[in-house]
Amino acid sequence: MIDKIICDELAKSSQESNVAVLLSGGVDSISIALAAHRLNKKITAYTFHLKDQPTYDAQKANEISNIMGWTCKTIEVPTDNVINDFIRLRREIQCVKKTHYECCFPFLYVYPQIKEKEVLSGWAADGYYGVSKKANIHYKHTKEKFDEFREDYFKLDHRAGYLWHKRIADMHDKTFITPYLTEPVKQFFWSKDWYELNQP
């Protein structure tokens, strides 16, 4: 069900036959890449890790790309210019919160490597599940409380730093496509309570 909704939303929003996918080892980004694959798009996956610090996510992104026949480019993010990078994030991207900096910093180096016009992402999908400590303690017990948590999470100025990431995409003249933030996907998840989404 959700895979069809994601495919439908991606078909509506993506106009290019060659697309970039921000790929990690997680199901959110993989589900977007698989949807693009089903739509017969040529996928170039982009993943990253800090210089000399390979990660599970980058390794898994390469593994799934090899299995699926996608090109995968791993970007090594340098750490020797962090002070200037963070100043740039404040001035150009308007980062304020710690999470803004953490989520945006690597993409200062990823986006210049992306050749495709459209950049697909599973951005903010984890917000639907309420897996944070805060959600587990305070919001999972009734659907009303769970919806309250999700309503706050998906406010425009939250969404896991979506607005700040999009500024980087815009700066590089890329179209940032996030199917998990579309209304039909939201409605699917909003029909479920915490237990339906998190228990077998």
Segments (PLM) and residue ranges:
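ATP-dependent adenylate-handling active sites, centered on carboxylate activation for C-N bond formation
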Residues: 1-200
